[in-house]
Structures are given as C-alpha cells and as structure tokens.
C-alpha cells in the first residue's frame, strides 16, 4: 500500500464530546507573544512621541532602509500611481470598492428616541469619530484590499478626516507601493503617509506640529485601524487609551468544517491560500470523515509545492497552529468550531446553511463550496479585517459601527424631573452621596416663589 505523505498534524477527538476547557488546551493554536517585543517597541513609541516626525524618519531608515523625502506623499505622486496602474487592476479595485460600500452603507444605525411620558426623552444618536488613521501593511505582500476594507466603513460612518499610512518602498522612490496609493486615490483619500511599523502607529497617535512647512504638519488621529505585524500590534497596544484601536490582530487563520461529501481539492487549496499569508498563519480542518481528512492531507502535500510562496506555505501548514481535527459527528464539529472561534470559518457540508446557523463564534462565516475565504478577502462585499486568536468569542470584524460612537442625549423638563425626583434622591441616599440628592431637591425647594 502506498504510504501517504502527511503535511498537517491530526488531532483525534473521536469517542467523546470534548469540554470547552479541553478544546482550548488541545486545539491547534499559534499566535504571537506581543509582550516579547514590547521592550523593542516601547522606546520607539516614546521617542516618536517626544521627537515626532524626525524620530519616525530615523526609525524608518533604520528598519526599512529607506528615508522618504517627506512623510506626507505629494498629491502628484498619488495621481501618477493611479495613472500608471494596470487598467484591469483598476477595474478590480473599483468593483471591490462598490461591493464593500454597498454592504457597509446598509450598516448605518438609525437614531432613536425612548420616551417616558411627555417631557422625558432619551435619544441615542451616533456620532462618527473625527479623525482616523488607517494602516496598510507592506511586508510579505502589498494589500490595497486592506485600504478598501478600512477606508470604506470609515467613510460610510461619516468620518471627516482620514489618513492612510503605509511603509515607504525603496523600489518605488521611497513612497508606499503604487497600488496602495492608487487605491487611496480611487477612494478619495488625499492624505497618505510614507511611514510603516511601530513608528507609524506612534506618529498617528501623537502627531507632529513642529514642521516648518504647514503642508507637513501631521495632525494626530483619534483612532487607528488596520492590520500589521507583531511590532505594529505592540505599538497599537502601547498607544491604546491615547487613541482608540480596532484590535490587536494576530496571524491570520482559517477553520473549515467539512463532512464526507466535501471536495478535498477545494479544501486543500483553501488551507494553502491562508497559509500563503504568513509562516504563522493557521489552517485547520474539522471533520467527521477520516477518509476526507486523509484525502485533504494528500492534496495539500501534492499541491502546496507548486505555489509561488511554497516555503512560507509549508512552514505554516507544518506548524503547531495548523492541523486536522477528527470528530464523531457534525454537532461535535460545531462545538469544536465555536471553541476555536476562527477568524474565517468555511462550512463544506450537506445543508451548510443549517450548520452555519448553529455557529456562534467566528469572525466571518463562508457558507458552501462556492464561498471561499479569498472571495471575502477581496470582493464579496464583507470586511476582511476580522478578530483573530479566538477573540471572535467576544468581538467582531471591522464595520461602519467601529467608527461610530453611540451617545445618549437626555432631556427631562421640570414636570418629568419632579415625577422621578424621589426615586433619584432615595438611590443617592442609599449610596451615601447626599450632594446628588441635593442637586435634585434644590430645583424644587422654592418652586412656589
């Protein structure tokens, strides 16, 4: 019998229904230790806070080996990037922008008012964040799609001031990659910074108003969103509180719930495509079919080596963060998937919609064989900035809501306040905060005068 070449580790959970604690111990999970790089990143953030753009440029030259002539990319450079871009890429970007905008425009919540009789209303309104910094990475790959996924929901929320920051590229004159600039142009973003890494995050958070040229004044933002490497994530942790952040994103991940009828070639390619991002990327198959597990492993082993990024893919698939989980049945597969809480979850089963309805924890759910994760990465219309490392148990992906602040507007007239005053005073006394009660009483003590 021909020996099967195995790429992915197999975890056999058959024979019992695992508990949540057991699953958190045994499921493949990689992740990164952000604490390990804080001693490197903290001095960078502090120096940029103190010295501004000069420090950011120094660190960019040290880490990226390139120093742009200015941090703010000139408008003519942005214009030229779009003019020079392949028309097919331009059309693809436009189509993705249109679909993402269509989805995110529908997410806008409506203002609503609750009334407690005449003269007592609580109105919840939604106010957009004023200024947002959007980070577009430029490491193993270039991500104009991330520009779209961050900019569009911010625009739909009504954010008035947007800046995109992306690493300068030595091969492109010290400016960010042209596709990043072109995407910004298509989206109507006019402020782009040639800055990456932890220094970009710090500069977005603290800004710099010391420049002689007013065009180079770099105003701080109120929120920073967008993916990045471990150093970017560590910097976001350090500036959190000074600004808001979307999340501390870890390495990307996919989990696939599949049964015996699933196509092993499709699953293999979906696992490979996610592993292509990063050597720390996680690719996990959860199945009740031992035969499917074996066939997927064979297909992965046969096909990964012909990809352009084969070494990266191989390391990711062989890592502790990737694997195949065998279970007794689909209900158990759902339990496992919920415990794993994948960034991306694909469902390849009979009645896949019914299975998807049972899922509680996932950044995004891709239902059926014709809804692969790469579709969501680019052009489905959904957002690809999603919670990682199990955080989908309590958080969700980037959306229009991310950039909106729900604010309660309270209005009570004299009659309405009088009606509830005894309740307020009683609670104030119960908490031993008598001045709270006096603030109510004083409004009615001389009411007849």
From Swiss-Prot:
Keyword NAD: yes
Record: residues binding substrate: 252, 274, 277, 344, 377, 431, 436
Catalytically driven reaction(s): L-histidinol + 2 NAD(+) + H2O = L-histidine + 2 NADH + 3 H(+)
A GO BP entry: L-histidine biosynthetic process
First-level EC class: oxidoreductase
Catalytic machinery residues: 343 (proton acceptor), 344 (proton acceptor)
Keywords: Amino-acid biosynthesis, Histidine biosynthesis, Metal-binding, NAD, Oxidoreductase, Zinc
Cofactor(s) needed: Zn(2+)
A GO molecular function held by the record: histidinol dehydrogenase activity
Cleaved signal peptide residues: none
Pfam families per record: Histidinol_dh (PF00815)
Positions bound to Zn(2+): 274, 277, 377, 436
InterPro entries assigned to the protein according to its UniProt record, in alphabetical order: Ald_DH/histidinol_DH (IPR016161), Histidinol_DH_CS (IPR001692), Histidinol_DH_monofunct (IPR022695), Hstdl_DH (IPR012131)
Pathway per the UniProt entry: Amino-acid biosynthesis; L-histidine biosynthesis; L-histidine from 5-phospho-alpha-D-ribose 1-diphosphate: step 9/9
Binding sites annotated in the UniProt record for NAD(+): 135, 199, 229
Cofactor binding: number and manner: Binds 1 zinc ion per subunit.
EC numbers for this chain: 1.1.1.23
Family, as annotated: Belongs to the histidinol dehydrogenase family.
HAMAP family, per database record: HisD
Protein name as it appears in the record: Histidinol dehydrogenase
């Amino acid at each position: 019998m021909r020996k099967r070449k195995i790429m992915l580790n197999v975890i056999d959970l058959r024979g019992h229904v695992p508990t949540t604690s057991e699953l958190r111990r045994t499921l493949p999970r990689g992740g990164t230790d952000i604490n390990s790089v804080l001693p490197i990143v903290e001095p960078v953030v502090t120096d940029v806070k103190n010295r501004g753009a000069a420090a950011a440029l120094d660190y960019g030259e040290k880490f990226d080996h390139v120093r742009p002539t200015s941090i703010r990319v000139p408008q003519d450079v942005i214009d030229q990037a779009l003019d020079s871009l392949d028309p097919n890429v331009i059309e693809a970007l436009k189509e993705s922008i249109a679909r993402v905008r269509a989805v995110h425009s529908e997410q806008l919540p409506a203002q609503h008012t609750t009334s407690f009789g005449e003269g007592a209303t609580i109105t919840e309104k939604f106010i957009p964040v004023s200024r947002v910094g959007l980070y577009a990475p430029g490491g193993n790959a270039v991500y104009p799609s991330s520009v779209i996924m961050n900019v569009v929901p911010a625009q739909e929320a009504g954010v008035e001031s947007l800046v995109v920051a992306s690493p300068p590229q030595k091969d492109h004159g010290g400016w960010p990659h042209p596709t990043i600039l072109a995407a910004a142009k298509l989206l109507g973003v006019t402020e782009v910074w040639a800055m990456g890494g932890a220094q970009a995050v710090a500069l977005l958070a603290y800004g710099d108003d010391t420049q002689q040229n007013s065009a180079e004044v770099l105003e701080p933002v109120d929120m920073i969103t967008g993916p990045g490497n471990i150093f970017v994530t560590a910097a976001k942790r350090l500036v959190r509180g000074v600004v808001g952040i979307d999340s501390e994103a870890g390495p990307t991940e996919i989990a696939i719930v599949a049964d015996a009828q699933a196509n092993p070639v499709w699953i293999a390619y979906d696992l490979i495509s996610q592993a292509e991002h990063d050597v720390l990327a996680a690719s996990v198959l959860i199945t009740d079919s031992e035969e499917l597990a074996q066939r997927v492993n064979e297909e992965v082993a046969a096909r990964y080596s012909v990809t352009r990024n084969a070494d990266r893919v191989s390391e990711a698939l062989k890592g502790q963060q990737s694997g195949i989980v065998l279970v007794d049945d689909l209900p158990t597969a759902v339990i496992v998937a919920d415990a794993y809480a994948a960034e991306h979850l694909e469902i390849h089963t009979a009645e896949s919609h019914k299975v998807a309805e049972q899922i509680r924890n996932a950044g995004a759910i891709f239902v059926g064989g014709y809804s692969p994760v790469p579709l969501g990465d680019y052009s489905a219309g959904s957002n690809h900035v999603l919670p990682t490392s199990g955080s989908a148990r309590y958080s969700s992906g980037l959306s229009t809501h991310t950039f909106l602040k729900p604010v309660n507007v309270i209005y009570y007239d004299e009659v309405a306040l009088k009606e509830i005053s005894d309740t307020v005073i009683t609670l104030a006394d119960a908490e031993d905060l008598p001045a709270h009660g006096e603030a109510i009483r004083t409004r009615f003590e001389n009411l007849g005068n």
